[in-house]
Amino acid sequence: MSDYKSTLNLPETGFPMRGDLAKREPGMLARWTDDDLYGIIRAAKKGKKTFILHDGPPYANGSIHIGHSVNKILKDIIVKSKGLSGYDSPYVPGWDCHGLPIELKVEQEYGKPGEKFTAAEFRAKCREYAATQVDGQRKDFIRLGVLGDWSHPYLTMDFKTEANIIRALGKIIGNGHLHKGAKPVHWCVDCRSALAEAEVEYYDKTSLSIDVAFQAVDQDALKAKFAVSNVNGPISLVIWTTTPWTLPANRAISIAPDFDYALVQIDGQAVILAKDLVESVMQRIGVTDYTILGTVKGAELELLRFTHPFMGFDVPAILGDHVTLDAGTGAVHTAPGHGPDDYVIGQKYGLETANPVGPDGTYLPGTYPTLDGVNVFKANDIVVALLQEKGALLHVEKMQHSYPCCWRHKTPIIFRATPQWFVSMDQKGLRAQSLKEIKGVQWIPDWGQARIESMVANRPDWCISRQRTWGVPMSLFVHKDTEELHPRTLELMEEVAKRVEVDGIQAWWDLDAKEILGDEADQYVKVPDTLDVWFDSGSTHSSVVDVRPEFAGHAADMYLEGSDQHRGWFMSSLMISTAMKGKAPYRQVLTHGFTVDGQGRKMSKSIGNTVSPQDVMNKLGADILRLWVASTDYTGEMAVSDEILKRAADSYRRIRNTARFLLANLNGFDPAKDMVKPEEMVVLDRWAVGCAKAAQEDILKAYEAYDFHEVVQRLMRFCSVEMGSFYLDIIKDRQYTAKADSVARRSCQTALYHIAEALVRWMAPILSFTADEVWGYLPGEREKYVFTGEWYEGLFGLADSEAMNDAFWDELLKVRGEVNKVIEQARADKKVGGSLEAAVTLYAEPELSAKLTALGDELRFVLLTSGATVADYNDAPADAQQSEVLKGLKVALSKAEGEKCPRCWHYTQDVGKVAEHAEICGRCVSNVAGDGEKRKFA
């Protein structure tokens, strides 16, 4: 028996079946680094229109977690897809390097500044620590396959960036947005510092809730207001609070102007409450016998005075819109030094912003004899006892509620009025302009717009000062007596910035005021405060984007971070850019959800459900992680677990197998010599290229819309359905058995080549390592890297005007599906083994019949059977299977007649008809020894 195997064009490629990504990727990365791939891309894209995705700086502390990976991979997919779309899209990664978490780490090791080390040495240790953290995170980000200028990232602690942060503040001062004031800010007594809103978390806490009576100073005036005379005992206005410790700072009682307030007679006294809350208050304080003597609107009680229960002064009733009927009494204890609403209304009424609490959370001397020096959280019981002693306590109970806590210490924080510096939201129209700018930005998903609008509309002035050691100094001089800023503040700040640019922030603390103030130095003091770390990152549009040469003066097109950054980086960047330049720092803002486990639970070390990106990369490879990110809808929570990653690995295998099939069947194909012109190609091959063209249109549209899960779904459909279960199956016969250099085979290879050129580019932004690997095996002259090129433009398709157009092949796909069902049933019934053992008769109505007949003898190749006949629908025998999909089709199956050809495996009547090749069929004889078969359609 002759060996005809050598006459077959069997697939062959060095591209491995298994990805072995965890082992192979590091080698690819080494090559990317050695070649300076990022530099090669920049050179290739020079002069193209720019797309700038500005990196929100992660905090330089700790290892990267799965959320970091999601963020960096999404950014990388966008940057790479923009590159393929013809943009120059430089990516400069950054890190946030100042701030409290780093200080705390250094404190843990070396003690607080001034203990073992001077403040200057402490800052040097902080800088050193941040640098080691940056190095650790950088290695992991690079391992993810993220391309960027990793050798020259921006760090907020770079001397030049520190100087530019000071300049940004100078510009804001110049535009009139800064003011100083004693104002209640979130204050952590453990940090001994003000906290930004983004540094506050909420946890459940048990507090004492109390109802307290403030007795009226002028009882007769109140009786007159309520038009009553028969009141038994003193009249009091009752407040309700969950922070008894703030009562020493009480300076007023807020009531709502439009609510009805009732004068209620109870045993031995009368109390004033919101009418709608009388019943609930009476239940709470345990009073069943009460009488409503009269009612008035809150506005009637404005400026009547009430005696503080133990502080020895009286306070006014004032009108406030923040009073609600949700809980309490309808009268709100108001301490302007301990709450933002209280502060705002206090300013309106000219109240003192009293703050009796020191930075460590204890009452200052002279507050009240039994409270001086006591920690406020331990003072509640003392205050309650005082109220009881004075007869002012109506009720006390414990209640569980959500309470603001320090994000770092997880301990409760307080509002505390301190002298701070603020960026004003309203004194120069910053709020109004910011709201206007928001409307000009594209928010992805679009609900982000309403979210940030509501935050900007309702946010207080931004407290930008901190009392910390490791941070950018505010670099201000204030007059010793008046505390006014120096008249030459902007000039002085630029002088400081120049020094910081050379020596870093330490230059400010080393600066002797005489050096730049001369004789005025005796009248001015240096402001010791540092800037809120959110000011550092929020000013990078100016301190980084505006000055990096690769951005060439272009503003950022996109900011992309987790959805918590509406209140964080997106907000601080918007505030600073609008205050400096009058415009938003970005054109598009994309947010992604948080990662959760397979059951939708938040990731937590204590539950043990965290997924380590390092582990995933070491076991499965970065491309699997990247594919999971891309295939997950980032607009909601992003679920990840071993099972979910396993599914991503399965999808990856399907894509890889498709790529491998293409490469293996391009064996011996040289596009420069072997390409077949479209008009000479087999129709099915042109259809396949057209499928790729349609897929590319969908995929590019999805990349453009940042719908990466759509990209993956379309890619999978193309690989699994259009190629895997139809086209690639059909062409195996022609590809393997036709003459090696025949038009029939070269047509097929031409299609595979076009498809591979397109596919490798679709993959590149997501499966970057695998695309690079595929690229290396593609035939023909090409650039060294897929990332320097653009989307493939060599695709074409069938014209609608052709008889065998896309609609024709869509119908054929359905026919093939129906035939497959019949074959599967026959296999289950043991009537046939493989599909080539079958011959089918298609009983079709005239329109479909004409289409099927048009394929002639090539219909069997489309159906993967050894025989295929078309007959009249009405002639179908009773056992023919009626199609559920195509009403005008019935399918009958019989065993194929003839012998099996050992070369092509088809059953035919002409095996052995040619004496020189007695074992094979006539078609194979033609392909081995003759001119080769001609294929026109399939």
Swiss-Prot record:
Pfam families: Anticodon_1, tRNA-synt_1, zf-FPG_IleRS
Enzyme class: ligase
Keyword field: Acetylation, Aminoacyl-tRNA synthetase, ATP-binding, Cytoplasm, Ligase, Metal-binding, Nucleotide-binding, Protein biosynthesis, Zinc
Residues bearing PTM N6-acetyllysine: 183
SUPFAM superfamilies: Anticodon-binding domain of a subclass of class I aminoacyl-tRNA synthetases (SSF47323), Nucleotidylyl transferase (SSF52374), ValRS/IleRS/LeuRS editing domain (SSF50677)
Record-linked InterPro entries: aa-tRNA-synth_I_CS, aa-tRNA-synth_Ia, Anticodon_Ile_BEm, Ile-tRNA-ligase, Ile-tRNA-ligase_type1, Ile-tRNA_ligase, M/V/L/I-tRNA-synth_anticd-bd, Rossmann-like_a/b/a_fold
Family according to the record: Belongs to the class-I aminoacyl-tRNA synthetase family. IleS type 1 subfamily.
EC number(s) recorded for this UniProt protein: 6.1.1.5
Short motif 'KMSKS' region, span: 602-606
Subcellular location: Cytoplasm
UniProt catalytic activity: tRNA(Ile) + L-isoleucine + ATP = L-isoleucyl-tRNA(Ile) + AMP + diphosphate
Superkingdom assignment: Bacteria
Membrane-spanning segments: none
Name recorded for this polypeptide: Isoleucine--tRNA ligase
Cofactor note (record): Binds 1 zinc ion per subunit.
Swiss-Prot/TrEMBL domain comment: IleRS has two distinct active sites: one for aminoacylation and one for editing. The misactivated valine is translocated from the active site to the editing site, which sterically excludes the correctly activated isoleucine. The single editing site contains two valyl binding pockets, one specific for each substrate (Val-AMP or Val-tRNA(Ile)).
Positions bound to L-isoleucyl-5'-AMP: 561
Residues involved in ATP binding: 605
Function: Catalyzes the attachment of isoleucine to tRNA(Ile). As IleRS can inadvertently accommodate and process structurally similar amino acids such as valine, to avoid such errors it has two additional distinct tRNA(Ile)-dependent editing activities. One activity is designated as 'pretransfer' editing and involves the hydrolysis of activated Val-AMP. The other activity is designated 'posttransfer' editing and involves deacylation of mischarged Val-tRNA(Ile).
Positions annotated to bind Zn(2+): 901, 904, 921, 924
Signal sequence annotation: none
